[in-house]
């Protein structure tokens, strides 16, 4: 048995009873071990492509305009030639499928521009209006510069998108591991950044999949503000693997700290 996307755990087993204690032991070993991450201060701000102001044109988000975006930029990368970008872009749908992040019955749409290739994922429709819906991936972009970005819907209910202090780190960690599982970025050091488009309608609250909220505190409503992290460090590639949870916690706390409700 092997975790193909990360290579973290590898062992053999005969029965489920034989496997379970090995998995539990490996989890305890990883939790008690040293952090796999190593950080280094950046000499200058990274040149990131943000999509916060682009809106959702071309994406099937079922009317949702507030999206979480996560960017991974490899350091010391020459980027891609037009031929390399096209080749990798054509492989993106297959790479997305292999990760298991998107169900096989959900269609994927590919698109391209001068500077990037993209794959979009249609949002799952809720059973009825106002039904709570968890966060979900809606787009993957690969830029000519080497940057790999994902956009996803935040958890939301009838009162709007939610920045849940517990759910947000888990969603970001999932996107980080998904990015690593695409097996595109292999450089030793990367820069990470996260942001939320149209954040005025978001609220810091607890997401409950079983029931929608009846009230929400929209401290940012009617105000113009940006909700994004400003990276000043690079980190090792383990941030897309064993160190994803640790990095995601930092990014989530930074986003929430910048929200007007946190003031």
Language model: regions and residue ranges:
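Cross-kingdom TIR/SEFIR domain
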Residues: 1-24
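Hydrophobic, Leu/Ile/Phe/Ala-enriched alpha-helical segments that form helix-helix packing faces
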Residues: 3-5, 27, 92, 96, ...
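Charge-rich interaction segments
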Residues: 16-150
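Alpha-helix boundary/N-cap detector
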Residues: 18, 80-83, 163-170, 235, ...
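Short glycine-rich, low-complexity/disordered patches
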Residues: 36-43, 104-108, 181-202, 257-263
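Short acidic, glycine/tyrosine-flanked loop/strand segments centered on an H-E-D-like triad
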Residues: 131-160, 214-231
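Substrate-recognition/cap regions that form aromatic- and gly/pro-loop-enriched pockets
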Residues: 161-211
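Long, low-complexity regulatory tails in eukaryotic proteins
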Residues: 191-263
């Amino acid at each position: 048995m092997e975790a193909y996307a990360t290579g973290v755990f590898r062992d053999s087993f005969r029965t489920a009873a034989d496997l379970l204690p090995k998995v539990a032991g490996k989890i305890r070993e990883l939790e008690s071990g040293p952090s796999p991450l190593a950080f280094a201060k950046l000499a200058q701000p990274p040149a990131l492509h943000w999509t916060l102001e682009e809106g959702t044109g071309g994406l099937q988000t079922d009317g949702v305009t507030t999206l979480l975006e996560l960017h991974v930029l490899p350091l010391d990368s020459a980027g891609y030639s037009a031929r390399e970008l096209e080749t990798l872009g054509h492989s993106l749908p297959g790479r997305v499928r292999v990760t298991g992040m998107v169900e096989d019955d959900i269609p994927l749409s590919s698109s391209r521009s001068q500077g990037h290739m993209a794959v979009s994922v249609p949002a799952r429709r809720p059973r009825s209006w106002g039904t709570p819906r968890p966060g979900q991936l809606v787009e993957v972009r690969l830029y000519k510069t080497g940057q790999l970005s994902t956009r996803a819907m935040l958890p939301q209910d009838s009162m709007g998108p939610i920045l849940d202090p517990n759910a947000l780190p888990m969603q970001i960690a999932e996107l980080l591991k998904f990015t690593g599982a695409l097996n595109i970025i292999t450089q030793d050091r990367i820069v990470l950044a996260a942001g939320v488009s149209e954040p005025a309608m978001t609220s810091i609250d607890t997401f409950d999949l079983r029931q929608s909220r009846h009230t929400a505190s929209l401290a940012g409503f009617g105000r113009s503000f940006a909700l994004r992290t400003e990276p000043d460090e690079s980190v090792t590639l383990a941030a897309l693997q064993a160190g994803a949870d640790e990095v995601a916690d930092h990014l989530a706390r930074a986003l929430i700290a910048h929200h007007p409700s946190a003031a």
